[in-house]
Structures are given as structure tokens and as C-alpha cells.
Amino acid sequence: MSSNHQHFRQPAIKGGESRVLSRRAILTADSLTLFYEDKKVIDNVSFSVKFGEIVTILGPNGGGKTSLVRVLVGINKAYKGTVRYFGKLGIGYLPQNIKINRLMPMTVEYFLLHTYLGRRAASDLEDSMKYVDVERLLKRQVAELSAGETQLVLLARCLMMKPDLIILDEPVSCMDIEAKHNFYKLVARLVTECGVSVLMTSHDLHCVMSCSDRVICVNHSIRCEGTPEEITENAKFLSVFPNNV
């Protein structure tokens, strides 16, 4: 199988340019197909994410969402199709499962400053904390954090890289309802105040409705796409996700 990741440089969004550039794509995926052994897990998927947009890939467990994300971020290279990125190309990626050695004594502050590869770690962390409330967690041990607190720390780490695009794979899967809503409010704020674009996956329709600009329903292939209001009225959506409406 062949794969093709392409990067294109484009000016960052500034001031009056935002309305124009926001119509342009920061990410395009064209005809992505992926097999695991003889099983086709992604079937001819094409879509785009625009500057300043929140796009959610919505689908059932086992429907190929994580496999698709792993293609987009370059982890899985054994696919057919093309992935193109535009912009300055700062990309933050928050996987569904991340391995942190919870047996090693390590504060949140140490984790953020010493697992980050930028040259201005302390300054970048300070900038990140303007948006993500992790200052109260800095002296806590990583092993003591709840699932929601861990995701906030990892999101803060993503922001330290000054990304143009943040890709979140099932970021709220271990959170309670209140924590989920707070996390999605934070994501919406990051788009508004930082000018980032967000692509995230979810299997929970009700939580993503409040902040997504566009939803792409995927069950190995794209079944429907549109605004949250449009997809809930789509017959294909109702047939694939009857329990989510």
C-alpha cells in the first residue's frame, strides 16, 4: 500500500485576514483507505478541516475513528490516499490512551517541562496556562490525577507547542458529564481566542453538539456529514446511530 503525506506552508491567520483564511482548509484527506490484514477498516474517506473550525468525527466504537486519526498524524503509514496539511504546521495530538509511568514520582510541573521539546518550556507553559487551568495541579503527582485532570495536563502540553491544529482522539471518554461539558467549552474557547483548528473523535453525540461546527459520521466509511442539526435529521445517521438521537 502507498501513502502520501504532504505539507504546504500558508500565512498564519492575522486580524482582518481571518475571515478569508478561515474558508481555506488546514487539513485535507483524500480517498483514505486502510486495511488491517484482510479487513478494510477505513474505506475511501475524504474530508477537510478549515482554519478556525471544530470538526468532530462521530462514530461507534470499532468504527475506525482511532485508525483514521493515526493515519492523519503519521503513525500509521500503510494506507492508500493523500493527507495534506497547510499553514505553519504546528500540530498538537492528544491520543485516546497515553502511557504515563505512574510508578515514577513525578509532579505535573516536571512532566510538562521535561517531556516538552521546545527551547522555551517555562515561557510556553506560562502561555498555555492562560487558557488551561493547570496551575493548581503543578505540584501534584501525575499518578494522583483523575482522568479529567490528566486530559487537561495533556492539552496544556499540546498548547505549549503553539499548534495551528489540535487533533483529539476521544478526549473525554473517561470523564463524567460535567467534566465533558467543561472540556468542550474549553476547546471552543481555544478556537475563539487562540485561532486554532480542532479535529476530534467521539462516540457521544450529545456532548459534541454544543461546540462542533461540523460533524462527520464515520463507520469505516463516511455515512453523512454536516452541521450537528443537519446530521441528526439524516436518514443514514439514524440507521447507523439509532441509540444516539
UniProtKB/Swiss-Prot annotation:
Catalysed reactions listed for this entry: Zn(2+)(out) + ATP(in) + H2O(in) = Zn(2+)(in) + ADP(in) + phosphate(in) + H(+)(in)
EC top class named in words: translocase
Segments forming domain ABC transporter: 27-244
S-S pairs: none
Signal peptide: none
Amino acids binding ATP: G59, P60, N61, G62, G63, G64, K65, T66
GO cellular component, one term: plasma membrane
InterPro entries: AAA+_ATPase (IPR003593), ABC_transporter-like_ATP-bd (IPR003439), Metal_Ion_Import_ABC (IPR050153), P-loop_NTPase (IPR027417)
Keywords, ordered alphabetically: ATP-binding, Cell inner membrane, Cell membrane, Ion transport, Membrane, Nucleotide-binding, Translocase, Transport, Zinc, Zinc transport
Molecular-function annotations in GO: ABC-type zinc transporter activity; ATP binding; ATP hydrolysis activity
Record localization: Cell inner membrane
EC identifiers of the protein: 7.2.2.20
Family stated for the protein in its record: Belongs to the ABC transporter superfamily. Zinc importer (TC 3.A.1.15.5) family.
Role, per record: Part of the ABC transporter complex ZnuABC involved in zinc import. Responsible for energy coupling to the transport system.
Oligomeric and partner information: The complex is composed of two ATP-binding proteins (ZnuC), two transmembrane proteins (ZnuB) and a solute-binding protein (ZnuA).
Entry protein name: Zinc import ATP-binding protein ZnuC
